[in-house]
């Protein structure tokens, strides 16, 4: 009727529904109702209808393992009702509904990537571990945290600066007492092998004499009230604020330009928060829907906030990303955003927002990450340890035990809470965290290869366990475990004081998934830690791994360690992607893609590099091989990259 519309898609019996973006609750979405309306949802629970990002998208997997996806191409408020089939109910003028059919859920994910775009390769440091809190303050406290990681030999790559570094919460400023020299702080962090990320919000303090407010006012960049002439004012952290109208290209260009001086302080990455946009002391937690945006014709021309609310955050991070790239054109940008819209993964990673330190959020972090990945956002993860509240050591250990293996791994907590660094809960929990993070860093070669795959075809990095066999109905509701790429299964230990029994993928041609562990820093094996997630390797896989490092580019990948688990034919295959870790050389062919195979031949396993692509020089590095055996033992060998390596099998 011009004001609202409905679209329905019938589904066959036995069809499982997923996606719908950032949603709390189980992985399988059948019977659920959610609403796409970006919301500041602090401490959200299972029945919270709207969170921080909007993805009007449903992935449907039929009983036979074939799949289709449905995208309601609307930016307006939209209800997704999955109680009886797939129903979209949206306000605003009728918009297209796009259906993607595929032979498998993987096929549909790739086609969604073709439609909405894929991530750009992030800087390699962004795939390391991130440490954050609201807030590390003053600057010397930041230095203490960084030094503590190094003194305790716990791997980490990034320290984050929350809002308290600013002068009175004024964006693009620094507190002259607590952060007198951000350039020196960032240089000190760099000396310890750390990168840094600093927060920027959209709410700009209404204050004459504040340069950002003055320059924005001179250019008339602010969102207007319904009368289309008066600037909208709303309260956020600095007090009364005005808000840039990112729907306008000129405003985005102005915003991007603000990053030039900001990034010149040696800033590595940017965190855009509160960009739903959040507004305090209002029942809706945001600005009025009749506020007016002066959007470009490319976005359909001017319109009300009801139309642009769900893309406000995405357009902000698009502008932020452009500013970061202009300031550091030789580096890959890293931007994290709380609010986003489907397709916004091209501009920013995301996290699952202001979760809580309780066992519900330990459980729900896995399906939330997976459904975001199934909705086109692969670079995501939760606040490990929980943002709101404190929790206890066992909770933190079990959260880190699997959270360290999610695509985005960041510990974070709120102001006033107890400390939640890996060492904050005592020696036993610290040991679990160190094992978990050492495991992540051993797997960086494999993870980086998965990020490259995602950048090429849109596949999620963390994938639901049913991707191992979409025809296995027993896996359709399994959300205590997840796949990293196609070849590693992560089984989390979630419930307090006991092991969780998860549904495992069926053997492949009679060969079961094989448990994998690594040496622990204390001389044992990491799998003996009851809080550690369990790892399993798909039959027929070669997993590239590396040595433990304090940060991802501390040393060259030498030796490369290949972990082999043969299939029923005695064969295995795997890939490794490498590049410079930053910059754009890989787009000009400066990378190395290697394909490794293993094959049992009488009493030996032959390991070869059978393909090599790219201009990156061969290093002639050492290659260590671990062949996993059915009886729980291993056979090992060593050689040089590019040479055949023979491993005798006992």
Label the predicted regions.
Residues 1, 155-433, 469:
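Aromatic- and carboxylate-enriched substrate-binding clefts and catalytic-loop regions
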Residues 57, 108, 112, 149, ...:
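A residue-level signal for conserved active-site and pocket-lining positions in enzyme catalytic cores
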Residues 321-335, 339-351, 364-368, 372-382, ...:
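Catalytic core of carbohydrate-active enzymes
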Residues 33-35, 51-54, 143, 252, ...:
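Short, hydrophobic/amphipathic alpha-helical packing segments
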Residues 59-64, 225-228, 506-507:
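Short acidic-glycine loop/turn motifs at beta-strand connectors
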Residues 633-650:
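Extracellular glycoprotein-like low-complexity segments
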Residues 52-56, 65-67, 75, 85, ...:
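Extracellular structured ligand-interaction cores
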Residues 1-124, 133-135, 139, 146-148, ...:
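Catalytic and substrate-binding clefts that recognize carbohydrates or anionic sugar/phosphate headgroups
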């Amino acid at each position: 009727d011009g004001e609202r519309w409905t679209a329905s898609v019938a589904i066959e019996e036995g069809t499982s529904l997923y996606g719908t973006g950032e949603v709390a609750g189980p992985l399988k979405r059948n019977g659920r109702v959610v609403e796409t309306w970006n919301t500041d949802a602090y401490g959200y629970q299972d029945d919270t209808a709207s969170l921080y990002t909007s993805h009007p998208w449903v992935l449907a997997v039929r009983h036979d393992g074939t799949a289709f996806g449905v995208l309601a191409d609307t930016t307006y408020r939209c209800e997704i009702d999955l109680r009886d089939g797939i129903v979209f109910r949206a306000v605003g003028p009728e918009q297209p509904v796009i259906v993607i059919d595929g032979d498998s859920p993987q096929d549909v994910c790739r086609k969604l990537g073709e439609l909405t775009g894929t991530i750009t390769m992030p800087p390699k440091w962004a795939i390391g571990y991130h440490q954050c809190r609201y807030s590390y303050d003053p600057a010397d406290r930041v230095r203490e945290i960084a030094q503590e990681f190094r003194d305790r030999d716990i791997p980490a790559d990034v320290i984050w600066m929350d809002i308290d570094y600013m002068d009175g919460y004024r964006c693009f400023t620094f507190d002259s007492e607590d952060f007198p020299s951000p350039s020196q702080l960032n240089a000190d962090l760099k000396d310890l092998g750390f990168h840094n990320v600093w927060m920027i919000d959209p709410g700009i303090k209404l204050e004459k004499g504040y340069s950002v407010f003055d320059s924005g006012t001179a250019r008339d960049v602010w969102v207007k009230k319904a009368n289309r002439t008066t600037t909208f004012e709303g309260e956020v952290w600095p007090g009364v604020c005005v808000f840039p109208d990112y729907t306008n290209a000129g405003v985005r260009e102005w915003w991007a330009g603000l990053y030039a001086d900001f990034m010149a302080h040696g800033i590595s990455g940017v965190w855009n928060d509160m960009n739903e946009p959040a507004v305090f002391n209002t029942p809706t937690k945001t600005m009025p829907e009749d506020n007016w945006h002066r959007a470009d014709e490319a976005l359909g021309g001017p319109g009300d906030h009801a139309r642009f609310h769900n893309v406000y955050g995405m357009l902000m991070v698009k502008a932020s990303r452009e500013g970061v790239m202009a300031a550091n054109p030789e580096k890959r940008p890293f931007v994290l955003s709380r609010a986003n819209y489907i397709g916004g993964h091209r501009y920013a990673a995301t996290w699952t927002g202001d979760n809580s330190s309780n066992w519900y959020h330990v459980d729900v972090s896995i399906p939330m990450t997976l459904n975001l990945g199934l909705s086109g956002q692969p670079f995501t993860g939760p606040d490990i340890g929980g943002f709101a509240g404190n929790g206890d050591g066992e909770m933190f250990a079990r959260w880190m035990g699997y959270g360290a293996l999610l695509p985005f791994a960041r510990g974070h907590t709120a102001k006033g809470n107890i400390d939640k660094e890996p060492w904050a809960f005592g020696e036993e929990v610290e040991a679990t965290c160190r094992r978990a993070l050492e495991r992540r860093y051993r797997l960086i070669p494999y993870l980086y290869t998965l990020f490259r795959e995602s950048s090429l075809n849109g596949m999620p990095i963390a994938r639901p366990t049913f991707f191992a066999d979409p025809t296995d109905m027993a896996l359709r509701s399994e959300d205590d475990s997840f796949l990293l790429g196609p070849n590693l299964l992560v089984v989390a230990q979630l419930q307090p004081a006991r092991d969780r029994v998860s549904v495992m993928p069926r053997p492949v041609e009679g060969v079961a998934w094989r448990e994998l562990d690594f040496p622990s820093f204390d001389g044992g094996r990491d799998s003996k830690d009851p809080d550690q997630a369990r790892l399993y390797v798909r039959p027929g896989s070669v997993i590239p791994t590396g040595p433990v490092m304090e940060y991802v580019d501390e040393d060259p990948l030498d030796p490369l360690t290949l972990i082999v688990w043969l299939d029923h034919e005695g064969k295995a295959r795997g890939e490794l992607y490498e590049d410079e870790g930053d910059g754009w050389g890989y787009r000009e062919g400066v990378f190395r893609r290697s394909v490794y195979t293993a094959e049992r031949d009488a009493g030996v396993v032959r390991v070869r590099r059978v393909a090599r692509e790219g201009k990156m020089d061969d290093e002639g590095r050492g290659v260590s091989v671990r062949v996993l055996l059915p009886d729980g033992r291993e056979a090992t060998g060593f050689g040089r990259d590019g040479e055949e390596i023979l491993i005798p099998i006992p």
